[in-house]
Amino acid sequence: MYQRMLRCGAELGSPGGGGGGAGGRLALLWIVPLTLSGLLGVAWGASSLGAHHIHHFHGSSKHHSVPIAIYRSPASLRGGHAGTTYIFSKGGGQITYKWPPNDRPSTRADRLAIGFSTVQKEAVLVRVDSSSGLGDYLELHIHQGKIGVKFNVGTDDIAIEESNAIINDGKYHVVRFTRSGGNATLQVDSWPVIERYPAGNNDNERLAIARQRIPYRLGRVVDEWLLDKGRQLTIFNSQATIIIGGKEQGQPFQGQLSGLYYNGLKVLNMAAENDANIAIVGNVRLVGEVPSSMTTESTATAMQSEMSTSIMETTTTLATSTARRGNSPTKEPVSQTTDDILVASAECPSDDEDIDPCEPSSGGLANPTRAGGREPYPGSAEVIRESSSTTGMVVGIVAAAALCILILLYAMYKYRNRDEGSYHVDESRNYISNSAQSNGAVVKEKQPSSAKSANKNKKNKDKEYYV
């Protein structure tokens, strides 16, 4: 298209196309708008691209109240009810998930992630138990205001705790736990990952430790049993129940729990969907899909009022409405955390920089912000949407091309009519000149003037000059 337009401009600029100066001016008439329109289209596309950048800056502070590590979550975990939140009020409550008897898993590795806010110093958040008689379990708890995990997969109780982070401050926190055999890792928010490697780094060494606890007099029968048991010392056998809330353990949790993920199960989402394998008892109330991350003042007020349902509900509603309206001049920014952050962190616990540019089902990752400041948290994602920018650029280029074609057609039409008029005028002049040459009378009238000039030349020749 552009080559054809250039050829048309060259023809108009040639001597046979309407004059060199006029053709040059005509070329400028459509080249300049073409350039300007193209730049406009590119600028439009660039502005669309810039409008869809979400910049989250990286910081270095460790003391904060929301998660910073955002990992790539599997595609199967990005739908559904993201960030389902339950409030456990005064008196405690409990959400229990039971595996069907014929579908109880035995796992060598486990992954657990959950968001919460509370002011309690002692509570049990989540506990997973094996079938009756096996004794395997995994428990996430708060002890003296510190978060920790305790589990047993066939030998002794193994404990791991984050002793540096205070989590009973009423702020929103995220905890991630992974287990592989007897080894475990624990991370709270953006604090460094804590690793726990118990004595006996392989099955044989751990089997030897277990054998020492069995009386020797039991003999060969026990040895054979230990050999079989040794292959299971790293396996969480026949998991039967997931208990959320700690009421059954005598340490009921009071506060908010959000987005629980355990080995592919999003239990709180299932509870909100009235799953047949889930039972809810006690003072437990569903809040909504967006976990409310409350400020220190609002959460402390709610907790000091004995976790009143009405106060907690009002605070949560206020936080949710504030998040929808955006940052208010008089309110602190409200952070939001979706299940994508929790679930993905459990799926990829060793990769802190694997950030997903794709969008969650609800329209983008949340922007974690500090509860008492304006600065975003480190490790956040930069999400770029290029579809709108591409559309804007294409529309701009098409508009520029259409405008240039219209200008070129109008200019060609105008100069074509002007050239035809000039041709008629030149033809009439040639006709008058030819008629004058063919008219004998007119020629005769001009003959006396020619005779006079001849006589004058003769007189000049007759003159004599003297020096």
Curated annotation (Swiss-Prot):
Keywords: Angiogenesis, Calcium, Cell adhesion, Cell membrane, Cell projection, Glycoprotein, Heparan sulfate, Membrane, Metal-binding, Phosphoprotein, Proteoglycan, Repeat, Signal, Synapse, Transmembrane, Transmembrane helix. Coiled coil: none annotated. It is a single-pass type I membrane protein. O-glycosylated; contains heparan sulfate. Heparan sulfate attachment is required for synapse development by mediating interactions with neuroligins. PANTHER family: NEUREXIN-1 (PTHR15036:SF51), PIKACHURIN-LIKE PROTEIN (PTHR15036). It holds the Pfam family Syndecan. Residues 1-45 form the signal peptide. This is Neurexin-1-beta. Residues 413-467 are cytoplasmic. The keyword Glycoprotein applies. Residues 324-339 have a biased composition (Polar residues). GO terms for biological process: angiogenesis; cell adhesion. It is found in: Presynaptic cell membrane. It comes from Bos taurus. InterPro entries: ConA-like_dom_sf (IPR013320), Laminin_G (IPR001791), Neurexin-like (IPR003585), Neurexin-related_CASP (IPR050372), Syndecan/Neurexin_dom (IPR027789). One of its GO terms (molecular function) is metal ion binding. Ca(2+) binds at D136, V153, I235, N237.
